[in-house]
Amino acid sequence: MRGVIGKLNWASREGMPQGAGDASLLASKMPTPTVEDLTEANAAMRRLIANDVPIWIRAIPFEDLSLVVFDDASLANTKGGFAQIGHIVCACEKKIHTGQRSPVSVLLYKSHKNPRSASSTLLNEATGKSEALADSEWVATWIGLCKDLEYDMRKRHLLNREIKIVSLTTNHDNDGLDLASITDAKSLFDNLMQQQYTGAEKRAALEICVIRDSLESLGGRVRWVPHDRNPADCLTKLRKR
């Protein structure tokens, strides 16, 4: 089991984001895995071997460069009842903001257990999005340094606005998920779209303020996409064998 998980971790870390969720979730089963866990690990390894997906880095002019980030959070599916959160940060062309198709380059991805004990799915979703935007700010700052040697990181909240990031979230359907997951996922989107935090717990409301601040510093906005169209979904749950 340790050997299989080690291979999964190495492959996903070096350039196979489709296996990052499996690797992280299976690693949380140690040091007391079950036979079912071993079966899941072997199935995950077979999927990676059978699906060799290249990561393309597209040539996008600096003046047309933008970012898009996909994020997702699960509910109590890791050891100890913690949530799994994950995100993918991609480079794209600015025309994606107007609904047009755009070439996309995966720059950064991450899947891990939520280190915070969250009392609601809304807080899990908010924590995942906040972390995704933090990595997006890091990428945007790196791009700013590449474009201008005089880039002042102390003014990144102003200079990064030209990136105009798009942050996408999902509202899960009810296939195998409880009603709370559906409601809270939509609640995050609703709370980001309005000024008042209707029904939001205080910690989640504070995290939403952080998200709004990150979106403002990146000149960004949040959008909603269906569960089955979110590429970050595979980062937060084990796929079926």
Predicted regions and their residues:
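Structured nucleic-acid-interacting core domains from mobile-element enzymes and related host factors
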Residues: 46-79, 162-168, 172-175
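RNase H-like nuclease module associated with reverse transcription
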Residues: 29, 115-241
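RNase H-like nuclease fold core
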Residues: 68-122, 139-141
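Conserved structured core elements
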Residues: 2, 13, 17-20, 35-42, ...
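Contiguous, well-ordered alpha-helical segments that form the cores/surfaces of helical PPI scaffolds
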Residues: 3-13, 21-28, 69, 75, ...
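A conserved non-catalytic segment of reverse transcriptases
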Residues: 1-6, 71, 76-89, 228, ...
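C-terminal reverse transcriptase regions that engage the nucleic-acid substrate
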Residues: 1-53, 226, 233
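Intrinsically disordered or highly flexible coil/loop and linker segments, enriched in small
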Residues: 10-21, 32-36, 50-54, 76-84, ...
